[in-house]
Amino acid sequence: MLDIQYDRSAREYRFTDPDSGEILTAPSGQKHQLFKAAVGLLDPALYDAALRVIENNPQLERVTWKAVEIITSDGVEVFPEPRGDVQAMVISQSDEYGRYAVSTEDGYYACQCEHWQSFAAPITQQGNRYCKHILAMYLWRVTREDRF
C-alpha cells in the first residue's frame, strides 16, 4: 500500500520513498497526481502498463487508476487455474469486507460489481466492458504473473 499522508499545516500531500527517503509532494486537491508519481517510482512496470491501457483506451483512464489502487493495496487474488468460470477475486474499495468475482462469460470478462452489472462500466472500441476489478485482474496478470 502506498502511504500518502496529508500535512494540514503545509496543505499538501506527502509521499516518502521507502527505499531512498526521497519525499514527493503535491498540493491539496492533487493527491491523484502524487499517487501516479509514487506508482511510477515504486512500480514502473505497473505504471507503464496502466499508461498503455489509457493510451489505447482513453475512456478507461479513471477505472485504470482505480485498478492500480487496488493492486497497490494487494487487493487482487488471481487463481492459477480458474475456479469454474471465476478467474480472480478482487477487493471492493467501498466495502472493506467485500470482494468481487471476475469471471468469463461467453468469452468476455464479467464482474459482480454494480458498475459492471448496471452497464455503466466504460466500453472499449472492441466492445468490451471494463470495470476497475476486471482491469485490476488484467494489470495484475500483465505485471505480476511472471514474477512468481
Language-model region placement:
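Long, low-complexity, compositionally biased intrinsically disordered regions
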Residues: 1-148
